[in-house]
A protein has these predicted regions:
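Tandem CBS (Cystathionine beta-synthase) repeat/Bateman regulatory domains
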Residues: 1-150
Length: 150
């Protein structure tokens, strides 16, 4: 059964802190939809339709195990599989790249540039899922820091 964290976040508006010093925690989305290993693909697809482009897969203690992307679901469909018959564990990316909340945003910019990642799960020191951050969150933070003209 999917779980949903109950806190909300967005980039802090009006902050003029230097972008180079901003942390992932300041701009990450804390409201995260997650799934478990046995969550079916059609349930995950429903979450994605609600605006979540990737769904982290966690264990009972919210430890990050993997992530299912829109692409993963499309590959399953292209293979002729019914999403209602496919478990997250069958299509997810295991041990996805993740980042800690204290990491500075320029570090994440390098990750996004060097990879095809669009979203990165945010985990604490025990690999517990605490948020997710997307490319657009980083861009929003950059603009809110007043760096658009730089």
């Amino acid at each position: 059964m999917p779980t949903k964290k109950k806190t909300t976040t967005k980039a802090r508006k009006g902050t003029k802190k230097d972008f180079g010093e901003m942390t992932v925690k300041q701009v990450m989305q804390k409201m995260v939809q997650s799934a478990h290993l046995k969550t079916k693909g059609d349930v995950i697809a429903s979450l994605m339709i609600e605006g979540f482009g990737a769904v982290p897969v966690v264990d009972a203690k919210d430890k990050l195990l993997g992530i299912v992307s829109e692409h993963d679901l499309l590959v399953a469909m292209d293979d002729g599989r019914k999403l209602g018959d496919v478990a997250a564990s069958e299509i997810m990316t295991f041990n996805p790249y993740s980042i800690h909340p204290e990491a500075i945003l320029p570090t994440l910019v390098h990750v996004f540039v060097a990879s095809d990642l669009i979203r990165v799960p945010v985990v604490d020191a025990k690999d517990k899922l605490v948020g997710i951050i997307a490319r657009r969150d980083v861009l929003r933070a950059y603009l809110s820091a007043g760096r658009a003209g730089c």
